[in-house]
Amino acid sequence: MSRHEKTKSTGGGLLDSLFGRPSKSKGGTISSGTLAHGGRPVSADNYVVPGVEDFEQYIQQLSVAELDAKFLEIIEDMNIPKDKREPLLAKSKEERQKMIMWHLKGKNSLERSANSRFEKPIDYVEYLQNGEHSTHKVYQCVESLRVALTSNPISWIKEFGVAGIGTIEKLLARSKNNASYEKIEFEAIRCLKAIMNNTWGLNVVLNPDQHSVVLLLAQSLDPRKPQTMCEALKLLASFCIVYERNGYEKVLRAITTIAATSFKASERFRPIVDALFASDQQDPKRDLACHSLIFINTLTNTPTDLNFRLHLRCEIMRMGLYDRLDEFTKIVEASNNENLQQHFKIFNEIREDDFEEFVQRFDNVTFNMDDATDCFDVLKNLVTDTTSEPYFLSILQHLLYIRDDFYFRPAYYQLIEECISQIVFHKGYCDPNFENRNFNIDTSLLLDDIVEKAKAKESKRSEEYEKKIEQLESAKQEAEAKAAHLEEKVKLMEANGVAAPSPNKLPKVNIPMPPPPPGGGGAPPPPPPPMPGRAGGGPPPPPPPPMPGRAGGPPPPPPPPGMGGPPPPPMPGMMRPGGGPPPPPMMMGPMVPVLPHGLKPKKKWDVKNPMKRANWKAIVPAKMSDKAFWVKCQEDKLAQDDFLAELAVKFSSKPVKKEQKDAVDKPTTLTKKNVDLRVLDSKTAQNLAIMLGGSLKHLSYEQIKICLLRCDTDILSSNILQQLIQYLPPPEHLKRLQEIKAKGEPLPPIEQFAATIGEIKRLSPRLHNLNFKLTYADMVQDIKPDIVAGTAACEEIRNSKKFSKILELILLLGNYMNSGSKNEAAFGFEISYLTKLSNTKDADNKQTLLHYLADLVEKKFPDALNFYDDLSHVNKASRVNMDAIQKAMRQMNSAVKNLETDLQNNKVPQCDDDKFSEVMGKFAEECRQQVDVLGKMQLQMEKLYKDLSEYYAFDPSKYTMEEFFADIKTFKDAFQAAHNDNVRVREELEKKRRLQEAREQSAREQQERQQRKKAVVDMDAPQTQEGVMDSLLEALQTGSAFGQRNRQARRQRPAGAERRAQLSRSRSRTRVTNGQLMTREMILNEVLGSA
């Protein structure tokens, strides 16, 4: 069959597809199925066109509906996108008829020429799979295939199928190793473009995890082949914006894989950057630079993670673009390629927007470009204008992400220093392998060890400071006690008529003087307590004595017989209307008690709603002295309407619930087991034998006696002396043993020992004195710190203005809450109430009165927030037992007195070895002096606590020092805990708020980015879409794939070149603005983690 007959036998070929002419089967019947060459099914109303030569007449005879239908079929066969069909469908009838005729003539001519050799898709596949054809014939076949793929309908492309795509893949793979296949590679990529110009072909390539087509296209990125690289960049960039199929990840993975096998994975973007600077001979119109820049914009704009975008951009810039950016700017400005200029503008906008977003994460951090350290200057000068500068800048940027934590920040820097040390000081005494980025660094426990060491160091330093403070406080109090003791001696000497030494020789110390007597005049004897008010009538009581604190004048004369006593002066503000005299005594009601010390009645608060009560025990004014804290307390000045209103709302009362009292376990008294200890000779001998078999077993009885005579405390430890005191037989037994020994009668070893040491006169007092000498330092150490702590704590409590303000504020809140109750208008409260503040909860049962107090102090009175810093000795004072101190002081005084008595009785040594007077005399002198000083310090502490009890109006005999300071400590610790709870809750709320804002911001940014990345094509449409690759390329070409960027919302900053010039100058900003520094973990994890 000739070529002409073969063409004729096709029955019109493409015309049959377009006009739906039914073909006759071998039996002569008309087939109603799908036509040949992928034609569409024939409908029942299709007309049969007799031949191609008659189609013009036939078109003229078509109705408008039929013409529209045929025109729509032609548009679909031409793969024209739907958004561009409207202008064509709006054409007039004559224009549409002409377009149909032109199209059919061209298709018919193309079909005749194409069918000269390749009739079906399988023909192309079989021909290209045959490797015996010459390069020229293969090129002609591929070029014809490209025309066929572009011209034929989708059904023809589907028939070409996966097998055809595989054939093109083999051609591309063969072209990599054959220089003569360069044109074939170019046409093969164009064939792939035609195949993927519909959703079916695009899904075939992008549905697999990694199709070989993507790898081959990535391998075609060679700047030495400009046309081929342009086509490959178009397809790869189009894949990146097919988000439904993860095209971006697949393209990036393909580029990385090819770079790892071809040159270096770390330089995967080098061909793309090199293409930007292709010569004029290779890229005269700068199309390659334009498509390379489009691809770079696609890579750096598509990811939603800012860190990843910055990382990619830094990697691309390190491939030489950073150094030659100014040169590329000149290339863009000199070119006439408007697309290149447009995409270079997009490149700068994307880069600046990402930098702006990066800077906005650290709005509270500013960089002082004029304040730099010498080390930074040296490093900056070393790397400036070198290839190391981008890496140095990247290191600085990474350092900004270190956690903002007091303990972990130094740990991070120490870890980084360790890494740099291992890299720079390489163990092989040479440069490390730069190709291998894995450095074996032991970091398993490094950070934890660093933090623990830092905490231990801080704790040790704090303990040292506290120890030094205690030593200074102890020395201060001891010096004051010594000065007081010396002053007493001076006064005693003056009273005895002995001239006192010069006062200049006395140390100048601040000795608290006794308080002045009450009253402004002289020093009269203390008056009896005032009588309570009495009702008028009856025998008149004697006139009341003058109130304490007022000038005492002569008492008024007694009233005449039968008359009542004169009424007391009216209270301020209590005068009768009109200023008339008060009624006669017989007509008066009960007398109002006169407030002492100039106290004024407390303000009664008008509270509208019932409130929870401050269950304190108010202090009666009559129990207060004129020096009491409550007399000077002016809590009304602290009142503010806003927080009192908040207090009324938060602590409004609800239906009273019966409080279930916690069962308090009664302390169980440990009954000592009464051991009936009987002193027997056998028991005494056994105890002495056990003692001698211990640390004294290497000494003879005579040597032990000599040690006792010499007072040798190096051998006689406190434990041995206590055992001797405990097990020593009574004096009559010792005397009896000495008599037996003197007669020369044999004695057992234990009795010989007892008889030997019994020869020492006053043995028992000697043992007690030696034991006192050894235990004296421990006894002093046991009570002296307590005395120092108690004294210092009393002074701190009395002098702390911050603590006084806290008490005033509590009095204000309590009086406000107790308005209308029996405890209202209290002048003071017992200090023990401080521990009960946490028992009062607000109306929501979520917060206590103590938490509210801590929050109120922080907001309204921040100067008093750290009042606990003024009470540094309260913790130790809470463990001070006054009875134990007094008992220890009595013991020491008694022991010193006994020692002094024994020294008087042992002035003459018993023998040459007797060193009692020599050894113990010096100790007794030092001990007496120190015990006297301790006694003065104890008296000073007791006096200060007594003054403190008068200051806060409590009974020191009922409210001991230990209980008082324990309550202060409990309140102080509870206040700190409440404040920490408030801070924690506030931080949690702030964190939630920031997290919500970050999520909303991230959602908005994600939505905006998704809007910019809105799918150009629907990859999951039920019907195959056409022209998808054209739409993707158009979106990239016009820049619509990168979205509409809001340039006005961004802060005005220097342009790219100017900013780079600024960064080139040594102006590293290191100072931080005032305000709370937003931590890296709080910003980065919330913004990126929620995305």
UniProtKB/Swiss-Prot annotation:
Key words of the record: Actin-binding, Cell cycle, Cell division, Cell membrane, Coiled coil, Cytoplasm, Cytoskeleton, Membrane
Record region (Basic region): 1-56
Coiled coil, from the record: 455-496
Subcellular location as annotated: Cytoplasm, Cytoskeleton; Cleavage furrow; Apical cell membrane
Pro residues: bias regions: 512-572
UniProt-annotated stretches for the region Disordered: 1-37, 499-589, 994-1021, 1039-1072
Domain DAD: start-end pairs: 1022-1054
GO biological-process terms attached to the record: actin cytoskeleton organization; actin filament organization; actin filament polymerization; actin nucleation; actomyosin contractile ring assembly; apical constriction; assembly of apicomedial cortex actomyosin; cellularization
Principal subcellular localization: cytoplasm
Domain FH2: 601-1001
Domain of life, per lineage: Eukaryota
Domain (GBD/FH3): residue spans on this chain: 59-431
Family (UniProt): Belongs to the formin homology family. Diaphanous subfamily.
PANTHER family listed in its UniProt record: PROTEIN DIAPHANOUS (PTHR45691:SF6)
Name under which the protein is recorded: Protein diaphanous
